[in-house]
């Protein structure tokens, strides 16, 4: 390769990484601690707002797990790329060695946090690396007496030899979901948006506004319509038979909360002149 395919290695990194998944639902604008949970299998979730994340997970029949998982995240400016030898890393030592080739500062932070948790006997930890374009991580079970280690081994030596489980991270936060479909464009996230009319065009438009970020990250989407969904509307409306004779604004808000959990959508059934937009 002679260093001529570095970009290709970075682009294909996710293919060579882990099969276990971590869903990340974090508002990057808000500093603070992160809560991590595991479903006990090959899926975990990290959030900074349990109520918002619970609404999303409930939609797909999961809900928020009860088993908490200690976690921390380290940011780096280095894009990950596979090594051309000894890949993928299988131990903490191999993972740290790889990180050192990318960003020595990041490696030091990861090792420091792992040692801190190892000393206080944290049983298992999730490590997330926030790098440009992609986030990834590893899970480590912090056993103090792994097979093959003698009593004279230091904590650091024991830590280095522990196996890792590679974790692929997928973002499910509102900002990412809006920006992913509008690369390079400004989204409606964080704005107050009003839509007058939830008929044939308005119903589909309301859904598109939601997918563009309206009603998320502190914003609000207000739908105004005084009419009800009638049988003659069913063949062409975004709403279906379950919304028959319901107020269109209210039914559309309910539908948006179903397809975009966590959205702040409000219905105004009446004259738009009386609405506080």
Please report, for each region that a protein language model flagged, where it lies by residue.
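ADP-ribose/adenylate-binding Rossmann-like module
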Residues: 1, 277
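Glycine/serine-rich phosphate-binding loop and adjoining beta1-alpha1 elements at the start
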Residues: 3-192
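Beta-sheet entry/capping signal
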Residues: 124-126, 192-193, 220-222, 264-266
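A short acidic (Asp/Glu
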Residues: 137-140, 204-207, 232-237, 276
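Phosphate/oxyanion-binding active-site loops and adjacent basic polyanion-contact surfaces
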Residues: 165-171, 197-203, 241-249
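Glycine-rich adenosine-cofactor-binding loop
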Residues: 181-230
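Glycine-rich phosphate-binding loop and adjoining beta1-alpha1-beta2 segment
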Residues: 220-263
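S-adenosyl-L-methionine
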Residues: 257-276
């Amino acid at each position: 390769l002679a260093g001529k395919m570095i970009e290709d290695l970075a682009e294909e990194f996710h293919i060579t990484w882990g099969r276990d998944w971590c869903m990340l639902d974090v508002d990057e604008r808000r500093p603070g601690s992160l809560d991590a949970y595991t479903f006990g299998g090959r899926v975990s979730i990290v959030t900074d707002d349990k109520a918002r994340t619970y609404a999303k997970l409930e939609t797909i029949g999961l809900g928020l797990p009860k088993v908490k998982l200690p976690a921390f995240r380290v940011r780096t400016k280095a894009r990950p790329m596979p090594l051309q030898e000894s890949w993928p890393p299988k131990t903490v030592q191999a993972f740290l060695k790889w990180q050192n080739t990318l960003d020595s500062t990041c490696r030091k932070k990861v090792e420091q946090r792992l040692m801190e948790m190892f000393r206080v006997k944290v049983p298992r930890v999730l490590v997330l690396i926030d790098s440009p374009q992609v986030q990834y991580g590893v899970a480590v079970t912090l056993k103090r007496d792994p097979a093959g280690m003698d009593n004279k081994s230091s904590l650091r030596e024991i830590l280095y030899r522990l196996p890792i489980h590679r974790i692929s991270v997928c973002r499910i936060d509102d900002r990412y979901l809006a920006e992913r479909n509008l690369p390079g464009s400004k989204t409606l996230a964080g704005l107050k948006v009003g839509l007058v009319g939830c008929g044939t065009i308005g119903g589909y438009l309301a859904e598109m506004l939601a997918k563009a970020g309206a009603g998320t990250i502190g914003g609000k989407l207000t739908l105004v319509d005084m009419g009800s969904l009638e049988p003659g509307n069913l063949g062409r409306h975004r709403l279906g038979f379950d919304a028959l004779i319901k107020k269109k604004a209210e039914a559309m808000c309910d539908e948006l909360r179903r397809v975009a959990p966590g959205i702040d959508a409000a219905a105004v059934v009446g004259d738009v002149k009386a609405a506080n937009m």
